[in-house]
A protein has these predicted regions:
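Conserved MFS/SLC helix-loop-helix module at the cytosolic interface between two early adjacent transmembrane helices
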Residues: 46-86
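Cytoplasmic helix-loop-helix junction between adjacent transmembrane helices
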Residues: 91-132
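Juxtamembrane intracellular "pre-TM" segments in multi-pass secondary transporters
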Residues: 175-205
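Extracellular/periplasmic helix-loop-helix junction of adjacent transmembrane segments
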Residues: 18-47
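Helix-loop-helix hairpin linking two adjacent transmembrane segments in secondary transporters
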Residues: 87, 116, 121-172, 176, ...
Length: 390
């Protein structure tokens, strides 16, 4: 499960060190337009999830997952040979469409087998492995461009997709039995979509996750510009980025150890408050124009630690009341959080002004809005130990 989830992180973060080379080769004149390499992928990734759940509920998890991995691998090959910016955008959208299945199906497979705190614990363990991908991906990209053309990054992604396809075909059993499959019919699908979009807890945590992810995507969109152009840290960019990302993995590991005892709400609500305090302080430092590289790295690492505690639990809480329509619910939530997060992140990225202010302020605002969504979901009460009727 974790390796499948890593296909997404690899397709994003391995690009970071090669952005200048990709931009030059494809004739991208405006530096900020390079962000479309990420955004095009994320839009395909998010939009495709709206159909994956319905297909998975009808045909089973395994078949649909195999189809998605095939599209991912084929699109990676297309990107390897793209000769224009437009061709790259098409390949990246298709790559995202293929990878969308890995997000929906992994969550649905876990939900088929677990629920509640046990689901959160399993997701946290998967996130530990998953989060090693953004730690290693920039270094993989950097290593490739040191010895070969940037196109070999996409060749690596194609190989990863093929290996994942073979492993799933060989080792993964079907988790949705025939008697539990839902036919493709307008009535049941509309009912499942309506339930996914009207459950207070599910919608509240889905929207909260959307804004938290939006802040993260804003950071990823501008990471290369921040470290290289603002802090002049080109030589140490991948190392610092990996260290920051490692704090997400550390948080997910910690979450897997404490969530069973403390509960999802206590852990994630405390982490969200910490997220807001840290990002607000970071924004104040950025506004003072006295920020140094080490300050940025420390504050960003603390932010990512809180993000790691929030992410696994918010996703699990959004899915928990919708187990009987897990495939469709996972699709709806994946579509909203990814497409919404991508657009928020693109908005933050396009406001890059040569300082860290847009990035840090974007994180703080997204955190505050996420808190508002949680308060709506929980009817104004935080840290509740058990789920109440909604």
């Amino acid at each position: 499960m974790a390796a499948l989830m890593a296909t997404n992180a690899l397709a994003i973060d391995s690009m970071l060190p090669a952005l200048p080379e990709i931009g030059e080769a494809l004739g991208i004149a405006v530096v900020s337009d390079r962000q479309w390499i990420f955004t095009a992928y994320l839009l395909g990734f998010g939009a495709s999830q709206i159909v994956y759940g319905t297909l998975a509920d009808r045909f089973g998890r395994r078949t649909v997952l195999l189809a998605g991995l095939f599209v991912y691998a084929a699109a990676s090959v297309m990107a390897t040979f793209a000769g224009t910016f437009q061709a790259m955008m098409i390949a990246r959208v298709l790559q995202g469409i293929g990878a969308g299945g890995t997000r929906v199906l992994t969550v649905s497979i876990v939900r088929d087998c677990y629920s509640g705190r046990q689901m959160a614990r399993v997701m946290s363990l998967a996130m530990i492995v998953f989060l090693t991908a953004p730690i290693l991906a920039p270094s993989i990209g950097q290593l490739i461009v040191l010895f070969a053309d940037w196109r070999w990054i996409f060749a690596f992604l194609a190989l990863f997709g093929i290996v994942a396809l073979v492993v799933v075909a060989w080792r993964l059993p079907e988790t949705l039995h025939e008697e539990n499959r839902v036919p493709i019919a307008v009535g049941p699908i509309a009912h499942a979509f309506a339930e996914s979009l009207t459950n207070r807890l599910a919608v509240g945590y889905m929207l909260a996750m959307t804004f938290i992810i939006g802040g993260l995507f804003g950071f990823i969109n501008t990471a290369q510009q921040l470290f290289v152009d603002v802090f002049k840290a080109e030589a140490t960019f991948t190392v610092i980025f990996a260290a920051i990302a490692a704090f997400m993995g550390l948080a997910s590991f910690l979450n897997s150890r404490i969530v069973g005892r403390l509960g999802m709400r206590r852990v994630s609500h405390a982490a969200l408050i910490g997220f807001i305090v840290i990002t607000t302080a970071h924004a104040a430092i950025a506004f003072s124009m006295t920020e140094r590289l080490w300050i940025f790295a420390v504050m960003q690492a603390a932010t990512m630690f809180c993000f790691g505690l929030v992410a696994s639990n918010f996703g699990a809480m959004a899915m928990d009341p919708l187990g009987h329509v897990a495939g469709t619910a996972s699709s709806v939530q994946g579509f909203v959080s990814t497409v919404g997060g991508a657009l928020i992140g693109f908005f933050i990225g396009q406001h890059f002004d040569g300082t860290s202010v847009p990035n840090t302020l974007g994180f703080a605002v997204c955190g505050l809005i996420a808190l508002a969504m949680v308060l709506v979901a929980e009817r104004g009460r935080l840290f509740r130990p058990h789920q109440q009727p909604v």
